Design a protein with these regions (language model features):
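Solvent-exposed coil/turn segments that connect beta secondary-structure elements
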Residues: 3, 16, 23-25, 35, ...
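Right-handed parallel beta-helix/beta-spiral solenoid domain characteristic of secreted/periplasmic
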Residues: 5-7, 17-60
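Extracellular beta-strand/beta-solenoid scaffold signature
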Residues: 8, 33-43, 58-65, 86-96, ...
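Extracellular beta-rich repeat passengers
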Residues: 66, 76, 106, 151-153, ...
Length: 232
């Protein structure tokens, strides 16, 4: 239902075929401002999962983590740390990992101390029509295959879009990502990632950063006012 719903403990779901639906991205708000237990806001390990039309705010750790799941749809979901860009914010806003057939559509991610929208060690991914602001990394595709990132707005992050393949993770060999039709503007927020995080090395003012990933296509994006480099 609509309203601000105060939640003090992490939620989890491990039953497949579930839809969690609110009434709107700014109407149904799960607030974890007074969270006392757990790290994530919502942790999902389930197939055929849909979450839509709601917001998750001010979690201690990751807002929405989806682990080892297949057929995931994240539609019109907002994750936000409402006090602005702080190193004490949770690392990830929308965070599918080791998953497949993932759609993120019309999402909003604000204030993550690592990545607003992060898809890691996953395959067959679409991130589209979404907005990422005031994160260290706006959108990050890491150690993943067959990802399309298109028609998104990334602005006021440290780095707008990152495509990485990192060592020492269970799944290696990131490749076949397409980044197109995105608006990547003014990603000049000072890096506020905690010391030791990989993204702590991303320079403020980065539009798109690609590292150690193969078969990447970048086309028909609009870049502007990224003070270090539009493409790195």
């Amino acid at each position: 239902p609509a309203g601000i719903h105060e939640i003090t403990r992490s939620l989890s779901l491990n039953v497949s075929g579930v839809t969690i639906a609110g009434t709107g991205i700014d109407e149904s708000i799960l607030s974890f401002k007074n969270q006392v237990q757990g790290a994530e806001g919502l942790l999902v390990s389930a197939n055929d999962f849909v979450i839509r039309d709601l917001a998750i705010e001010d979690t201690i750790g990751d807002a929405l983590k989806i682990n080892e799941s297949e057929n995931v749809r994240i539609l019109r979901v907002r994750t936000e740390w409402t006090n602005g860009p702080l190193s004490t914010n949770g690392a990830y806003g929308i965070y599918p990992v080791q998953s497949s057939n993932v759609l993120i559509d019309e999402a909003v991610a604000i204030g993550a101390s690592d990545a607003g929208i992060y898809v890691g060690q996953s395959s067959r991914i679409i991130v589209r029509n979404s907005r990422a602001e005031y994160n260290v990394a706006g959108i990050e595709i890491e150690n993943s295959t067959f990802a399309d990132v298109h028609d998104n707005l990334t602005t006021n992050n440290t780095g707008g879009i990152l495509v990485f393949d990192l060592p020492n993770l269970p799944i290696q060999g990131g490749r076949n990502t397409r980044v197109y039709n995105n608006q990547i503007f003014a990603n000049n927020t000072d890096n506020f990632a905690p010391d030791g995080n990989i993204v702590a090395s991303v320079p403020a003012g980065t539009g798109l950063m690609i590292m150690a990933n193969d078969n990447i296509e970048v086309f028909e994006n609009n870049f502007g006012n990224n003070n270090s480099a539009n493409i790195l």
